[in-house]
Amino acid sequence: MVTRCAEKIKPVLTYIRKALIAALLLHCDETGTRVEGKTRWVHNASNERYTYLTLNSKRGYAAMEEADILPYFTGTVVHDCWNPYWKFDNAAHQLCCAHLLRELNGVIENHSDQTWAEKFRALLLKMKKAKDRAIEKKKTELSYSSVHRYKNQYDELISLAYSENPAPVTEESKRGKKKRGKVLCLIDRLKKYKGQVCLFLENFSIPFDNNQAERDIRNIKVKTKVSGCFRSFDGAVEYLNIMSYIGTAHKHGINSFRAVLFAVWGKPYAFGVGTE
């Protein structure tokens, strides 16, 4: 029945993929799973209305290309700063600030001398609160002066961070650059991607975090933890196709059992178009 269901929903998956390409906002994430005793990667592309999961032996750019959404997407993609996402420069990018908060918490807990990290965490939360309050008041944007003030504070804290973490000096007798630690790499990232960290503050349609993608991929993590692995690659693909369909059904207020039943009957829900 699994194979039959997976076969019947193929046209719907094509529609979901096209709907995500045409969307203004896309959440992306990836997680490892076990297939035939080997590590394989589940890639998620989703938003509040659609879920699309694919399987690949690779985690990076090639796998994202094969998923066939990001190469054509021109809206805003939210992600955790995994380097291959930046190669898709046809889209705008928003970094997951919840992920950044976790990294900052790690710095705070493990490096008591890093005063900038606590202040930077407070700034991100202050920015989020300012946006949330504005939305509660039915506003569609923050004032230019407010955004400018937060960005200035951002720059000041980056300067403080560098003052507390001077770049390592390479001895003249040794070749190459000296390796930068995790803290300095985080600071470099925050400086380089300031625009992609703060985008949510300037555009209220863009979220602060990537929780949507994390929710949509959570079932895969649970299945991997409980069941161990998939027996075959084709079986894993069928499972992900069905989970894409069920996840999308749930977002449209459709009961999972009903959605699968209609698919097996050869009448899968074609979301946004009606029932085929």
What do the PLM-derived regions correspond to, one by one?
Residues M1-E276:
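Catalytic center-proximal scaffold of phosphoryl-transfer enzymes
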